Amino acid sequence: MTQLEAAKRGEITEEMKFIAEREGIDPEKLRRSVAKGYTVIFRNVRHDWVKPVAVGNVVRVKVNANIGTSRDIVNVKAEIEKAKVAVKYGADTIMDLSTGGDLDSIRKAIMHAVDVPIGTVPIYQAAEEMLAKGKAIIEMSEDDMWNAVEKHFKDGVDYTTIHVGVTKEVVEKMKRVKRVVGMVSRGGTFLAAWILHWGEENPFYRDYDYLLELAKEYDVVLSLGDGLRPGGLPDAGDELQIAELYTLGRLVRRAREAGVQTMVEGPGHVPIDQIPAQIKLAKVATDNAPFYVLGPIVTDIFPGYDHITSAIGGAIAALNGADFLCYVTPAEHLGLPTVEHVREGVIAAKIAAHAVNLTRFEADFKKDYLMSLARGKLDWARQFELSQDREKFIEIRKERPTKTEACSMCGDLCAIKLINDMLRKG
């Protein structure tokens, strides 16, 4: 029985109890949201050691960190370190997007290195295996695609991105609807190219019921991928993006009827003023399915700083209903991220998520309240304890010391110290 089926029956599962306690919410409130499909729980039945995580409308906004090898750089130890660093700095989930090396062993190593839910994009493996054989990606058979999906499910991944909305119909529209950037989703492009080459329907769309059967067996959350997300600001909100979105909405409803948990992925690159409307449209089109966004990135001309451009968009998206933020690192659009890039990306995304969470959860606001108290007292030890990045706190304090009880920015001119001293004197 899946979490969705249990919730529909009125059952509060052990995973729901665990999550409700961690989130500080009523288990029954969580159950009702799961039953409606508004919240999903990541916990593959074969992933025994994972601490389940929920994403949806009654829990905190969550953050995902993407890691993984590439065909140019295969360093498994580095990827495991990235996973550990991401979790240390607050990532709620990890996606292994490896495309180089022994993908099966890499995936398993990452899964055993951390205790958070793991997501993948199975078609990456199907494509990589074609290249490893000296074949073109479009030579993938339907069995190759399905075998990759089932392998990931059996290995215990908790959610998978499946670009089921890249249909033959929408691919035909691509010939007419011109984009500035084109198609930037790797998995979506693999399927679009395959459709164009063979003239066949996307197997995941055509045989969606079979996909639901597989997902149901392992209680894997299907993350319905946005293969036609905008890859640049000029393409935001175009016909292709919206057509795919409505297809995903229909597939969400079919999954719920089958007892399978689903969430929907979203953009992408979006001008800042369009973000609220895009999120609200997505929520309506998908009947309030949990919405998982990459950014959105709000400007395209700051490569090297896209952890910041995405955090800005992520905060606005979350405030307007996005439930799950995929981090972006400073290396986005430039190359494979380093461990330090991962750390910076997670922190930026966590800032965006926390900025929204503190408006909804008293416990989250209390953290900021306590920091304000500590700052008002110039209590540096307490500020250190409350800091989300203690290493950075210490680094700056040591680099820029002062002999005063304030910081080296103001020293004896510190506004807080001056007014506190005067108030104490009466």
Swiss-Prot record:
<dbReference type="InterPro" id="IPR038521">
    <property type="entry name" value="ThiC/Bza_core_dom"/>
</dbReference>
<feature type="binding site">
    <location>
        <begin position="226"/>
        <end position="229"/>
    </location>
    <ligand>
        <name>substrate</name>
    </ligand>
</feature>
<keyword id="KW-0004">4Fe-4S</keyword>
<dbReference type="InterPro" id="IPR037509">
    <property type="entry name" value="ThiC"/>
</dbReference>
<keyword id="KW-0479">Metal-binding</keyword>
<dbReference type="GO" id="GO:0051539">
    <property type="term" value="F:4 iron, 4 sulfur cluster binding"/>
</dbReference>
<dbReference type="Pfam" id="PF01964">
    <property type="entry name" value="ThiC_Rad_SAM"/>
</dbReference>
<feature type="binding site">
    <location>
        <position position="333"/>
    </location>
    <ligand>
        <name>Zn(2+)</name>
    </ligand>
</feature>
<feature type="binding site">
    <location>
        <position position="265"/>
    </location>
    <ligand>
        <name>substrate</name>
    </ligand>
</feature>
<keyword id="KW-0862">Zinc</keyword>
<feature type="binding site">
    <location>
        <position position="124"/>
    </location>
    <ligand>
        <name>substrate</name>
    </ligand>
</feature>
<feature type="binding site">
    <location>
        <position position="66"/>
    </location>
    <ligand>
        <name>substrate</name>
    </ligand>
</feature>
<feature type="binding site">
    <location>
        <position position="407"/>
    </location>
    <ligand>
        <name>[4Fe-4S] cluster</name>
    </ligand>
</feature>
<feature type="binding site">
    <location>
        <begin position="185"/>
        <end position="187"/>
    </location>
    <ligand>
        <name>substrate</name>
    </ligand>
</feature>
<dbReference type="GO" id="GO:0009229">
    <property type="term" value="P:thiamine diphosphate biosynthetic process"/>
</dbReference>
<keyword id="KW-0408">Iron</keyword>
<feature type="binding site">
    <location>
        <position position="95"/>
    </location>
    <ligand>
        <name>substrate</name>
    </ligand>
</feature>
<dbReference type="InterPro" id="IPR002817">
    <property type="entry name" value="ThiC/BzaA/B"/>
</dbReference>
<protein>
    <recommendedName>
        <fullName>Phosphomethylpyrimidine synthase</fullName>
        <ecNumber>4.1.99.17</ecNumber>
    </recommendedName>
</protein>
<keyword id="KW-0411">Iron-sulfur</keyword>
<dbReference type="GO" id="GO:0009228">
    <property type="term" value="P:thiamine biosynthetic process"/>
</dbReference>
<dbReference type="GO" id="GO:0016830">
    <property type="term" value="F:carbon-carbon lyase activity"/>
</dbReference>
<dbReference type="GO" id="GO:0008270">
    <property type="term" value="F:zinc ion binding"/>
</dbReference>
<comment type="function">
    <text>Catalyzes the synthesis of the hydroxymethylpyrimidine phosphate (HMP-P) moiety of thiamine from aminoimidazole ribotide (AIR) in a radical S-adenosyl-L-methionine (SAM)-dependent reaction.</text>
</comment>
<keyword id="KW-0949">S-adenosyl-L-methionine</keyword>
<feature type="binding site">
    <location>
        <position position="163"/>
    </location>
    <ligand>
        <name>substrate</name>
    </ligand>
</feature>
<feature type="binding site">
    <location>
        <position position="269"/>
    </location>
    <ligand>
        <name>Zn(2+)</name>
    </ligand>
</feature>
<comment type="similarity">
    <text>Belongs to the ThiC family.</text>
</comment>
<comment type="pathway">
    <text>Cofactor biosynthesis; thiamine diphosphate biosynthesis.</text>
</comment>
<keyword id="KW-0784">Thiamine biosynthesis</keyword>
<feature type="binding site">
    <location>
        <position position="414"/>
    </location>
    <ligand>
        <name>[4Fe-4S] cluster</name>
    </ligand>
</feature>
<keyword id="KW-0456">Lyase</keyword>
<feature type="binding site">
    <location>
        <position position="292"/>
    </location>
    <ligand>
        <name>substrate</name>
    </ligand>
</feature>
<feature type="binding site">
    <location>
        <position position="410"/>
    </location>
    <ligand>
        <name>[4Fe-4S] cluster</name>
    </ligand>
</feature>
